A protein has these predicted regions:
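Non-catalytic alpha-helical scaffolds and adjoining flexible linkers that form interface surfaces
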Residues: 2-30, 35-226
C-alpha cells in the first residue's frame, strides 16, 4: 500500500426505519425500501435466509436497524435488530392490514429514494400507531391520512385549491378538512365515493410533487370497503 494511503472502513450505526416495500434480488438477498429517521427515504441490502423473519418486512413495520455504510455504493447494508411495536391491531385485522398496504405505497411512491422531509418519519409513526389503536369504524382513515400527508409535505390543502381535482366530491372533502379524526371517521360514504375522493387527493399530490403516483392498492382497498 502506498505511503499515506488509508483503507476506507465501512461505518456502522443504528437507526429507526418504517418499512415501505422490498424487492427480492435472490433467495438470500432483498432490497428493503424504507423511511428512516436519520436518512429519510433510503433503500438497503438485507441478507435473508432460512432463519430470517420475513414478517419484519411487512409494510409499515417500525424496526430498529443496524446499518452499515457501503463506501462503494449508495446502497448500504442493514439487518433488523427488533420491531419497535407489535402492531397487532393492524396485523390481526384484514381491513387495517390492507389499509397499511395503501399507506405504505403512498409514501413509497411519493417520497423518492434519497429524499428527506423534516418531521416526516415521526409523523408517519403517529399515523401508524393511530391506525393500530383505532377500535371503531376506520373505513375513512385513508382519506384522513392523505389529507394529513399533504400537510406533512408542506402543502396544506385549501378548499378552493382542491376543486379542480375533487369536482362533485368537493363538499365531502371540505367536510373532512373541517373534521378532527373521530368526526372524520363517522362521515357516511359509499365505497365508490371513498375511492373517488382518495383518487382526487392523489391527483392533488401528483400536481404538487410534479410526479405520477400510481397507487395499485387503492383498487384492493375499494373492493374491500365496497
Amino acid at each position: 500500500m502506498a505511503s499515506g494511503a488509508r483503507r476506507q472502513v465501512d461505518t456502522a450505526m443504528d437507526d429507526s426505519a418504517i418499512i415501505l416495500n422490498y424487492t427480492k434480488i435472490r433467495d438470500n438477498l432483498i432490497v428493503v425500501h424504507a423511511l428512516t429517521r436519520a436518512y429519510g427515504r433510503k433503500s438497503f441490502l438485507v441478507k435473508t435466509g432460512a432463519k430470517a423473519k420475513m414478517a419484519y418486512y411487512l409494510p409499515l413495520n417500525i424496526l430498529e436497524l443496524s446499518i452499515t455504510e457501503n463506501t462503494k455504493s449508495d446502497l448500504w447494508y442493514a439487518s433488523p435488530l427488533a420491531a419497535k411495536y407489535p402492531l397487532l391491531g393492524i396485523r390481526n385485522n384484514v381491513f387495517k392490514n390492507t389499509m397499511s398496504l395503501f399507506m405504505a405505497e403512498v409514501v413509497y411512491r411519493t417520497i423518492k429514494d434519497g429524499a428527506q422531509e423534516d418531521g416526516l418519519f415521526d409523523w408517519c409513526v403517529r399515523q401508524i400507531l393511530t391506525l393500530d389503536a383505532l377500535q371503531a369504524d376506520f373505513s375513512n382513515y385513508h382519506i384522513y391520512f392523505l389529507l394529513e400527508f399533504c400537510i406533512a409535505l408542506g402543502f396544506r390543502p385549501e378548499a378552493t385549491d382542491m376543486i379542480p381535482f375533487t369536482g362533485e366530491y368537493q363538499p365531502f372533502v371540505e367536510q373532512f378538512m373541517r373534521s378532527d379524526l373521530p368526526t372524520a371517521m363517522l362521515i357516511p360514504l359509499s365505497g365508490r365515493v371513498r375511492s373517488e375522493i382518495a383518487s382526487s387527493i392523489i391527483r392533488y399530490l401528483e400536481f404538487h410533487t410534479e410526479s405520477t403516483i400510481n397507487i395499485r392498492s387503492l383498487q384492493v382497498l375499494h373492493e374491500l370497503f365496497a
